[in-house]
Amino acid sequence: IDGAHIQDKKGEEGMRGPHILFLSRSKGIKISGVKLRRASNYAFMSYDIERASFDNLLVEEGWDGIHIRGGKDIRIRNCRFYTGDDAVAGGLWKNMVIENCYMNSSCNGIRLIMPATGLKIVDCEFRGPGKYPHRTSGEQKRRNMLSGILLQPGAWFPAFGEVKDILIS
């Protein structure tokens, strides 16, 4: 699925267009074997999802690869990310597993911006500099990866709750 990097001067930051896939209040989701390219915003954006699996995805360019705000029993496995922003981001996660993924980013591999409980990050590889420039770095076209894993609940806005039961191996 090609998002074509559509720019919208009335969009977020005066440039962002639509997400490639957007789901809200959904359960029992399986996305497998899909290639998501040149997202005009996030490749996958969701609010309040449960029992979701993402397997064997290839995400290239765009902003965030997978951005989940509110998720329970989520599995992200065997995916390859080459993003111009965070590979996986969001928060309010309960029982999320991110396993055997390759993350090449010009921002962060995994960025937690809200609380999470039961997060497991297993056998993932984080590699910079990014293949594609950071989407909002303008003429600078910054490619350096800032962090492999960044746990910063409340960094964007007040986010109440705990970060607990985190495993990184």
Q: Locations of the language-model features?
A:
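Extracellular/periplasmic carbohydrate-active domains that bind, remodel
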Residues: I1-S169
